[in-house]
Amino acid sequence: MTRIIAGTKTEFSIDPAILALLPEQGSVELQRDAAGKVHHFHTHPVDEILVIIKGALKFEWDGGERICRPGDTILLPAGTRHQSEALAEAIYAIAMLPPAANPASN
């Protein structure tokens, strides 16, 4: 059953860094990882941009490693092998964009 709940939220703001991730037509996913959650090494066929909102992620890619914290942005070209581990509960935004739609790759 479809329901619309009107008027329960009167204020909602989106961080400009998150808005900047939105393609002309598309979406941004919010992800929450519990402390200790590991996303093992993998790749994507599209460019990926992550913005850390809360917590800390140990982010690894072929040839590098870094602890990422709120405000950090990770730019991953298509095909980049990477993994992450939440060092504390982490919340981050993810945009997956075809290379032509990614302003960071143009």
Give the positions of each predicted feature.
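Short acidic-glycine-tyrosine-enriched beta hairpin
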Residues: G63-A78
